[in-house]
């Protein structure tokens, strides 16, 4: 599936269930991820959290949203973001739309120097 076929117009207007289905149908998430997201139960178990970081005392949930259609080096990306501020993902979406209308951005890096 090429980048244009992976686009999901008006993604923000879809219900949560429709968004999960749409990203799976376009190959953005795996079948296992789709099944996990479709359950609506995403709480990290305390036992798992304790193995991930030191001094665990609890788990805090944040909404997981997707920044859609960021074009970098002529490839379209979907950016997962766990944030509590609604305008962050909306701003990424607006910026991505403007950028993609002008062929996206190009990124490069230098060889490591250390």
Q: Model-derived features: where do they sit?
A:
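Mobile "lid/hinge" segments at catalytic clefts and subdomain interfaces of large enzymes
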Residues: 84, 88-108
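Acidic/polar, glycine-rich intrinsically disordered N-terminal extensions of enzymes
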Residues: 1-77, 81, 85
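Flexible hinge/switch segments at interdomain interfaces of large molecular machines
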Residues: 111-114
């Amino acid at each position: 599936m090429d980048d244009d076929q992976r686009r999901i117009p008006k993604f923000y207007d879809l219900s949560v269930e429709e968004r999960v289905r749409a990203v799976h149908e376009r190959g953005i998430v795996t079948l296992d991820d789709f099944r996990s997201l479709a359950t609506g139960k995403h709480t990290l178990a305390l036992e798992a959290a304790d193995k991930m970081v030191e001094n665990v005392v609890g788990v805090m949930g944040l909404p997981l949203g997707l920044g859609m259609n960021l074009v970098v080096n002529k490839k379209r990306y979907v950016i997962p973001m766990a944030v509590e501020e609604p305008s962050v993902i909306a701003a990424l979406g607006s910026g991505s739309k403007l950028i993609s209308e002008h062929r996206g951005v190009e990124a490069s890096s230098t060889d490591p120097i250390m």
